[in-house]
């Protein structure tokens, strides 16, 4: 289900499939969703049509986290439907309806973001417990591994985002918090504790990009789980990008 906040009301749109992520497109009121069986366009009425799916996508896999780069390309990872399926996880790029493989050999590809000022792409493969940095070619969308940017010691890393200073904000599944790490040193700078163990993702929003929005997964016995939280951290985020239908 895709939930959209409009004028203080929540609009819920059923997809009939697992939905890993959704991003707005450059067409007003339209969204691009990464579902179990591929990439689909949506609007407030539901699914409009399928764009496509990777020809080499393994069986029993679905799309998970996804995000657009500044060129309007969608990057989306795939994970096993029923847990760990080995290192068959991949990161795909959708550009102008064409799908290409960016990374492979991962177990559970998850959060990602770009630092265009430094020419870096950050990617999480959850079981590794790290955030990895890659040199990023914005013209070709190619990546090459650079270094480990941060090591997560409480829980495992899930979703992530960057702030305006280039720091890494990481949702720590099983750790009950979002932590901020300096990109150059990996040192922890700040943390936001949540009343939920399984913190799944985070992003900056609001008029001034100074609100951190945090998602949590429902967990039996935890009254504070399964909610979307908002908090001020003293940091500002970066502009996010929509999918470009060129």
Sequence positions of predicted segments:
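A short loop-to-beta-strand structural motif that recurs across blades of beta-propeller domains
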Residues: 1-3, 38, 89-92, 130-132, ...
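Short loop/turn segments that connect beta-strands within beta-propeller blades
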Residues: 5-8, 43-47, 94-98, 135-139, ...
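Beta-rich, blade/repeat-based domains predominating
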Residues: 16-32, 57-74, 82, 102-120, ...
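Short loop/turn segments immediately following the C-termini of beta-strands
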Residues: 36, 79-80, 126, 136, ...
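Loop/turn-rich, solvent-exposed surfaces of beta-rich toroidal or solenoidal domains
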Residues: 130, 150-185
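Blade-level signature of beta-propeller repeat domains, shared across WD40, Kelch, NHL, RCC1
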Residues: 203-246
